Amino acid sequence: MGSKRKKAEKQKDFVKAKLRVGKTAAKPDNHTDTSFIAKSISIPNQTINKKTSNTEKKYEVDLAHHLSLTKHHSDVTRKEVLNYIEQHLPSNPSLYKDILTSIVPLIIDQSQNVRNALTSLLSACATQQVGLLDLHIRSIILFIHSAMSHIKPDIRNSSTKFLSVLIDHATESLVRSYFIKTLKSYFTLLSWTLTNDKKAVSLAITTSSSIGGPSKKARIHHLSILRAFLSAALFPISSNERKLDYSKIKMIHPESYKYLLASSTQPFASLKLFVQEVPKQKNTDIQQNTKKDDNAFSLNDLDTVSTEDIDTRRKVMLDVFMAPMLRNLKNLIKEGGEVGREAHSCMKVLEQLQSETK
């Protein structure tokens, strides 16, 4: 009896179970259940990573949504979005890169209300984050120069408002890197000529009549900003306005300041180490403006001249821009009124430069 029972028990291991419809197959005896879920233990006081709060995440999402609306087809929506961003500027400096990347193209927006709101927003951003416009001046000045030569008269008339913001908040970066290009854009904006030949004068008159010259009110504002730009570029900063005076700092060596970090952004941009420029053809009409002095700059030299120091800016002004600017300012003074008054103030700046460089 015992042997039969043992044989029956051993035989059970080799018997194949019959499957029934609607019922799952029987699990083997050595089956291990792996359906459990491990629970994590969180200790907030001992965590290393600092998580952002829900309010910060919500604000970043809200800011990204409003920045996307800067490309809305309605000018009213674009203006309201700019006003909203100005009233809710973030305290996190890393968010300002996305803000400026989205709003700078609106410098050439078709709506005047949008451009006015953008001027206020740029000033607010520069006040909130000191040095912000210096970091993004390359893209900002690109759109400003484009606005100064735009085909739309309204965009040209409001272009110097943005230049005024740069003069107030990014003076050194503006005059050091973009002095020549800004003056050239000013000549285009005011329909002035750099040369006195008949071909250039007739071309300027034709261009001004076809695209429409600046209005009287706009010319007053343009000349006012031009005076501020020339004063900032051609005269040294006073000791009260200077951010850091190295002469009053005690150092190990009197020339230690030369080896410190530069106070300006991109101090070696003038060397053009990583820039490939296309060679330009010489223009015979421009060569007529070249002076007999070998050390004097000509219009052909302006593309390769670096205006990092004030002496170079003064020399460029005296050699190239002084004579045509005085000639055009005298014509504006003859008109009288507020335009003549602003032109006279610009001429005073140039006369002061001439008296100091004699």
UniProtKB/Swiss-Prot annotation:
Biological process (GO), any one: regulation of DNA-templated DNA replication initiation
Pfam families, per the entry: Ipi1_N
Leader sequence residues: none
Record key words, sorted: Nucleus, Ribosome biogenesis, rRNA processing
Any one GO molecular function term: chromatin binding
Keyword rRNA processing applies: yes
Purpose: Component of the RIX1 complex required for processing of ITS2 sequences from 35S pre-rRNA.
Record family assignment: Belongs to the IPI1/TEX10 family.
Quaternary structure and partners: Component of the RIX1 complex, composed of IPI1, RIX1/IPI2 and IPI3 in a 1:2:2 stoichiometry. The complex interacts (via RIX1) with MDN1 (via its hexameric AAA ATPase ring) and the pre-60S ribosome particles.
UniProt protein name: Pre-rRNA-processing protein IPI1
